[in-house]
Amino acid sequence: MNDLRYPIGQFTYKRPITEEMIDTWIQEIEDLPNELTKAIKDLDQKQLDTPYRVGGWTVRQVVHHVVDSHMNSYIRFKLALTEKNPTIKPYKEEKWAELPDSKLPVDVSLVMLESLHKRWVNLLYSLELEDLEKTFNHPETGETKLAAAIGLYAWHGRHHTAHITSLRKRLNW
């Protein structure tokens, strides 16, 4: 049986990272707002409040989490581009998912995601090759190059979209 936590598998990538890989990943980041919107299309409130797996987040929490995560990533990119290997601040995503704003209508986060991704994609397309080598330091996972972070967040968007689409498929929604 597939691991419901990782419907598209865990994040991996081939080395070295090529310009073609970067372009594909940026396109996936650019496409995410539309893909996530399609994934939740026509879901009612009960469906939005259904966990994608036992013990997992609800569809609503997943949508809000994607925005929380990608806002943090956008800031991490800006820090890495303006400071030398900055140490970023991790956050407790499971606790953020329990805050009151995670119960808001999903449209609130979809609008934020659309705007955020327009800015982020603009920034990503402006990067030079040397910018892709810049890094940030995560206190728990260590140093990350921006090139790899682009891939990670492209995967992250597809990963959470697949949580929703696989739930829909399993429950025939």
Curated annotation (Swiss-Prot):
Pfam families in the record: DinB_2 (PF12867)
Family: Belongs to the metal hydrolase YfiT family.
Molecular function terms from GO: hydrolase activity; zinc ion binding
Cofactor: Zn(2+)
Name used for this protein in its record: Putative metal-dependent hydrolase BCA_2790
Organism of provenance: Bacillus cereus (strain 03BB102)
Location relative to the cell: Cytoplasm
Binding site for Zn(2+): 65, 156, 160
Chief localization: cytoplasm
HAMAP family per record: YfiT_hydrol (MF_01256)
Gene Ontology CC: cytoplasm
Cofactor note: Binds 1 zinc ion per subunit.
InterPro entries: DinB-like, DinB/YfiT-like, Put_metal_dep_hydrolase_YfiT
EC code: 3.-.-.-
Enzyme class: hydrolase
Subunit structure: Homodimer.
UniProt function note: Possible metal-dependent hydrolase.
Alphabetically ordered keywords of this record: Cytoplasm, Hydrolase, Metal-binding, Zinc
Cross-referenced Gene3D superfamilies: dinb family like domain
